Amino acid sequence: MTEPDVAGAPASKPEPASTGAASAAQLSGYSRVLLKLGGEMFGGGQVGLDPDVVAQVARQIADVVRGGVQIAVVIGGGNFFRGAQLQQLGMERTRSDYMGMLGTVMNSLALQDFLEKEGIVTRVQTAITMGQVAEPYLPLRAVRHLEKGRVVIFGAGMGLPYFSTDTTAAQRALEIGADVVLMAKAVDGVFAEDPRVNPEAELLTAVSHREVLDRGLRVADATAFSLCMDNGMPILVFNLLTDGNIARAVRGEKIGTLVTT
């Protein structure tokens, strides 16, 4: 399952946010969020799981939940399998995508375990039925879990090949009535240029969906982005590797890049 990266380089300090409606929205904070995590980060750059990384993410999420915010999570599976890459090696695309979906379930179960060690009741819901390890994806049940203060992790992507976990994040956010998609990356946000090419590239702190589209800036894959743009769902792109950034994002502090209609 493909997950485009935001163009970026090693993290740098975010620039001051520009004024306007997007900044005003960011300052208001959020009560229900959909957190999108890339699978590669769970592996610490390697194949498999890095327990230290998963534990650090779980601690950040637990702090947010204890503050009364409802949080759902979508995790990629790139630390195990990436369907598009396996296809390039000759594997049939639909089969490789299903392998990627199973990778997201492994990540979901790992995060559930570390969250419950933090004392946070967590439910995993999967788009592919696997009753021994997770609930089936039922949006009304997911909302009920959130209202009870539980974390809900959505695994197995959309349950369909050719759809990325970015698209899953956008669709799930809309269906559960989230205020925002928090797109956690290994970079500070969205840049005007690729910082790997231009180290002085400007970090954009607030842009519109239309501007992202017109300028060809990479935030999420096209399907995910279209869903968010058409339905007015804001996306906040921020650096997960900075400890405490999930809580800062939820509080509406000026970090990363806020994309609004």
UniProtKB/Swiss-Prot annotation:
Catalyzes the reversible phosphorylation of UMP to UDP. Its main location: cytoplasm. It comes from the Bacteria. Residues 1-23 are annotated as: Disordered. Its EC number is 2.7.4.22. Keywords: Acetylation, ATP-binding, Cytoplasm, Kinase, Nucleotide-binding, Pyrimidine biosynthesis, Transferase. The keyword Transferase applies. GO terms for cellular component: cytoplasm; plasma membrane. It is an enzyme of class 2 (transferase). It holds the Pfam family AA_kinase. The modification N-acetylthreonine is found at residue 2. InterPro entries: AceGlu_kinase-like_sf (IPR036393), Asp/Glu/Uridylate_kinase (IPR001048), Uridylate_kinase (IPR011817), Uridylate_kinase_bac (IPR015963). Belongs to the UMP kinase family. GO terms for biological process: 'de novo' CTP biosynthetic process; UDP biosynthetic process. UMP binds at residues 77, 97, 158-165. This is Uridylate kinase. Homohexamer. One of its GO terms (molecular function) is magnesium ion binding. The keyword Transmembrane helix does not apply. It catalyses: UMP + ATP = UDP + ADP. ATP binds at residues 36-39, 78, 82, 191, 194. HAMAP family: PyrH_B.
